[in-house]
Amino acid sequence: MTPAPKSSFVLGHRHLLGIEGLSAADISGLLDLSEEYVELNRQVDKKRTSLRGRTQVNLFFEASTRTQSSFEIAGKRLGADVMNMSVSSSSMRKGETLMDTAVTLNAMHPDILVVRHHASGAVELLARKVDGSVINAGDGAHEHPTQALLDALTIRRNKGRIEGLTVAICGDVMHSRVARSNILLLGIMGARVRVVAPSTLLPPGIERMGVEVARDMREGLNGADIVMMLRLQRERMNGSFVPSSQEYFQYFGLDQKKLAYANPDALVMHPGPMNRGVEIDSAVADGAQSLIREQVEMGVAVRMAVLEALARNLPNA
């Protein structure tokens, strides 16, 4: 059994529905606790008992590999009883509403619900109907808070800070919940954020979020410390937003030539899954400046920290 983390941080919120509403102190506290779990997860014995006796339900209405498996591993390492609910075989496939599903699950007294849904705002609605804590694992194009937290942890571990860095977020900003959560978090933590995309993939009024806007990669990557690539979210697109994948890669795909526009020590990130040859070239994704595999490792640590920080607020904790 691994030793308990030294951090006693408690998240002062019942749920984690988004980055919006978190303070810099909340974010720093979660990142500090996550740092401890990074080291604990590298030990042979990774088990903890902080969620022993607690029930964690992973309720995913959208397909997921990284996020769902990461939350499952995180919960089990903390000692929780983890249940993955298959929506394909659930009552919702038979016509039950989201709210009825929430009421039904609540009657089983889960302590923590981890929810992903294709509709923006659906997770917040569900949270109103349950007694336990709810973690948003991604809702439509709205938010994906744990992805932004793991990205922040990855940046902080490699750059030593977040404040003052220039972060270029490139690609399908319009349909990306990852972009929105990262813009919010990086702004709270004092980074300079620039979004880089063709006009068709920029949400109207994005400047109101306090970001700079660039419509070509040379301008967008100039002076960047971090280059964060986003995939084309075709499942959320109604119509054509780019002429073709090949033309998109020509102008907005990250290859070695375009990466040279950024600072020499710039680092590359991607939330996954990647579309190689569309938004990123394999030579960059697998190259020395890539943090993409490290992001996956940080995901487990961050989700353990979030689960523990919320569990410390639960009754009888």
Curated annotation (Swiss-Prot):
One of its GO terms (biological process) is 'de novo' pyrimidine nucleobase biosynthetic process. Carbamoyl phosphate binds at residues 66-67, 116, 144, 147, 272-273. Catalyzes the condensation of carbamoyl phosphate and aspartate to form carbamoyl aspartate and inorganic phosphate, the committed step in the de novo pyrimidine nucleotide biosynthesis pathway. GO terms for cellular component: cytosol. Heterododecamer (2C3:3R2) of six catalytic PyrB chains organized as two trimers (C3), and six regulatory PyrI chains organized as three dimers (R2). Pathway: Pyrimidine metabolism; UMP biosynthesis via de novo pathway; (S)-dihydroorotate from bicarbonate: step 2/3. One of its GO terms (molecular function) is aspartate carbamoyltransferase activity. It is an enzyme of class 2 (transferase). It comes from the Bacteria. This is Aspartate carbamoyltransferase catalytic subunit. Its EC number is 2.1.3.2. Transmembrane segments: none annotated.
